[in-house]
Amino acid sequence: RDGKFWLLWKSDTNAPHVRGEVEIFSQELSKDGISLVGEPTSIFGADATGSEIIENPDLVYYGNKLYLVFSAGWWADETYYTGTALCNSPQGACELFDFEAKSGTYLGRPVVGPGGVSVIDNGQETLVVFHSWVGGTAGTGGTRTSVVVTAEQLIKFAN
């Protein structure tokens, strides 16, 4: 909204040889998207979620507010979910928001471990793309599938 481009990433400190707090960082990009501007800023930590890991960060403007959307938990089982934080700016601070899309029944079908969210505004509606387990989980022979819904549908599912 401010005409600037931002890069988001998570620290990989959940790796066995590192062991530290997993955080999400943001840093401004140059107008051509090639160079970094300024210093990175930690905007959110996994400790706020009660999960050991957070990943797949995305900043989304929706309803005139800025949200950080992320996946939390372990992707291979039903504890994986999509969480949100409300942010003051792309540089933080971001605070956990009371909206989570967790495993459950959605539009008459089971959704297990929803994560990997991408948000797309096509000018007419806001679409949310995520993946979910079908027929079990990683340990029980399940497969991942993509799901595309409107933001309004996802909000109804999560509440």
Regions found by a protein language model. Give the residues of each.
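Carbohydrate-active catalytic/glycan-binding domains of CAZyme proteins
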Residues: R1-N159
